């Protein structure tokens, strides 16, 4: 079975990885000190990656404020749901607000508009 996590945590992890990728790109630029053009190019690309990360963090923050808050029945902690189905942020329990999906096996495809399941 695939390892699932909540959508908010996935997007936050992506944003954090952009920060580290940006730092690595900038660090690679240090190896090209002889060529000012190449060093500058890597520094700018790294800075763009970090800037993109900031935008993603801002976007997920705005999205997180609009997410539905529910109490997880398994761990009894408050968590947020994005879409029709999501996972608990704390215990990874599948959650849904759609009565038609209760009791069904968790599948991320339920969030797609053209889901046939």
Swiss-Prot record:
The chain crosses the membrane at residues 13-33, 41-61. The keyword Lyase does not apply. It is found in: Cell membrane. It is a multi-pass membrane protein. It holds the Pfam family DUF2614. One of its GO terms (cellular component) is plasma membrane. NCBIfam families: PRK02935.1. This is UPF0295 protein RBAM_008830. It comes from Bacillus velezensis (strain DSM 23117 / BGSC 10A6 / LMG 26770 / FZB42).
């Amino acid at each position: 079975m695939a390892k699932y996590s909540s959508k908010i945590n996935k997007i936050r992890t992506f944003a954090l990885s952009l920060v580290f990728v940006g730092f690595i790109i900038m660090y690679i630029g240090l190896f090209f000190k002889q060529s000012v053009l190449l060093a500058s190019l890597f520094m700018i690309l790294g800075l763009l990656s970090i800037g993109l990360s900031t935008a993603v963090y801002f976007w997920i923050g705005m999205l997180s404020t609009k997410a539905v808050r529910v109490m997880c029945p398994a761990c009894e902690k408050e968590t947020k749901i994005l879409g029709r189905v999501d996972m608990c942020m704390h215990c990874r329990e599948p959650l849904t607000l759609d009565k038609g999906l209760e009791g069904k096996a968790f599948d991320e495809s339920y969030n797609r508009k053209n889901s046939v399941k």
